[in-house]
């Protein structure tokens, strides 16, 4: 039976090999988990704002939001 555990070497594989050199290594502590949580919360707020604008539940003074003009085309 042939040993196929090494796989085939390709030009693309050789190019991408350095990107996988950190495989299995874990940074000590929480790392950037807190930063990721902050950005997730900001993204959630952004989505809520967009949803409220779309549903016209947020009144924007001086900015008309007429969605019917988009359906003419």
From Swiss-Prot:
SUPFAM superfamilies membership: Photosystem II 10 kDa phosphoprotein PsbH
Location, primary (coarse class): plastid
Alphabetically ordered keywords of this record: Chloroplast, Membrane, Phosphoprotein, Photosynthesis, Photosystem II, Plastid, Thylakoid, Transmembrane, Transmembrane helix
High-level lineage: Eukaryota, Viridiplantae, Streptophyta, Mesostigmatophyceae, Mesostigmatales
Taxonomic superkingdom: Eukaryota
Family: Belongs to the PsbH family.
Name of encoding gene: psbH
Organism, scientific name: Mesostigma viride (Green alga)
Spans through the membrane: 34-54
Keyword Thylakoid: yes
GO MF, one annotated term: phosphate ion binding
Name this protein carries in UniProt: Photosystem II reaction center protein H
Modification after translation (UniProt): Phosphorylation is a light-dependent reaction catalyzed by a membrane-bound kinase; phosphorylation occurs on Thr residue(s) in the N-terminus of the protein.
Function text: One of the components of the core complex of photosystem II (PSII), required for its stability and/or assembly. PSII is a light-driven water:plastoquinone oxidoreductase that uses light energy to abstract electrons from H(2)O, generating O(2) and a proton gradient subsequently used for ATP formation. It consists of a core antenna complex that captures photons, and an electron transfer chain that converts photonic excitation into a charge separation.
Keyword flag NAD: no
InterPro entries named in the record: PSII_PsbH, PSII_PsbH_sf
GO BP annotation list: photosynthesis; protein stabilization
Example of a GO cellular component annotation carried by this entry: photosystem II
